[in-house]
Amino acid sequence: MALRASWKGFLTVGALSCHVGLYAAASTSERISLHMVNRKTGHRLRRQYVDEETGEPVEADAQVKGYEVSKGEFVTVEPDEIADIVPAGTKTIAVNTFLACTDVDTAYFDRPYFLAPVDEPSAEVLKLLAAGMSERKVAALGEAVLFRRVRRLLIRPVAEGGALTACTLNFDYEVRSAQEQFADVPKTRISGEMLELATHIIRSKPGKFDPSAIEDRYEDALAALVRAKMEGKPLPKPEPRREEKVVSLLDALRASAGSPDKPAPKRAGAKGKAAGTKTAGSKAGSAKAGGSKATGTKTRKAKSAAASAGAQTRRTGTTRKAG
């Protein structure tokens, strides 16, 4: 099913212009959703705004936003007052700068979108732009009024396909200072055996990012739990947690490097061993990826089974009895 555009407008780069849409590249809609339910009746609960002091429900026409200036004291802001301060939008993403893809700290990344054409003439312009950016290995910095605010977007070419992605960027005041966060971390110099072991471990575990190998174990467990309850089967038992022994940093490095009693070999002498480790790691990675896909399939089957069981339960009227 084709995605629905979150925004439509024009992308302009100098004299070039094309009609584009922003389509959300990530979504949580496939996750299992749980609702609040009355335990006694089985009916779904609904939220209601009540006055903090009187406890009385407040009708929609009496509700207004407010900024708290002191404890219990608010300055109210009317909807039309907010509408008046929204920047005038031109429905245009204006690109004014090209820069290296690595120039923007990932802490500024907000939400990812697919930047796609909405007609055939625009598709040709976008492909041309994507090809040029890929050739130069650069990203574009654009600006547009999105969802009431003037937002900056980092536009990057997709590795394959001649397409573009756009990521809204956090404002500078929203990104916390790394210097402040790490100000209390003691400055120490790491050298000798500890550094050799650390670099050996890093060299022995090369790989590539594979999103399919990342398992959402909570989602899988939740699907299994819901399915078991709907089918009246025993609930799955949690796996016992292993108690980790507290060891020194050096001992932990030695154990990770597979050398508990002596330092890791020098880089030149470790080629054969590293190569062997890489092969084993590749097999393990393949097995893990395969297991992940199987797990994902089981999750989808669990959701499908849950949906089917839910429909059957609603027909027989046993949902509320199950709790």
Swiss-Prot record:
Q: Name one Pfam family in it.
A: Ku
Q: Please report the stretch or stretches of sequence annotated as the Ku domain.
A: 12-197
Which InterPro entries does its entry note?
Ku70/Ku80_beta-barrel_dom (IPR006164), Prok_Ku (IPR009187), SPOC-like_C_dom_sf (IPR016194)
Q: Which residues cross the membrane?
A: none
What are the recorded GO MF terms, alphabetically?
Answer: double-stranded DNA binding
- Output one GO BP term: double-strand break repair via nonhomologous end joining
Residues of the region (Disordered) are 255-323
Highest taxon listed in the record's lineage: Bacteria
Q: Which SMART domains match?
A: Ku78
- Here the segments flagged for biased composition (Low complexity) are 271-297, 304-323
Quaternary structure (record): Homodimer. Interacts with LigD.
Q: Which family does it belong to?
A: Belongs to the prokaryotic Ku family.
Briefly state the protein's biological role. Answer: With LigD forms a non-homologous end joining (NHEJ) DNA repair enzyme, which repairs dsDNA breaks with reduced fidelity. Binds linear dsDNA with 5'- and 3'- overhangs but not closed circular dsDNA nor ssDNA. Recruits and stimulates the ligase activity of LigD.
**Name assigned to this protein:** Non-homologous end joining protein Ku
Q: Gene encoding this polypeptide?
A: ku
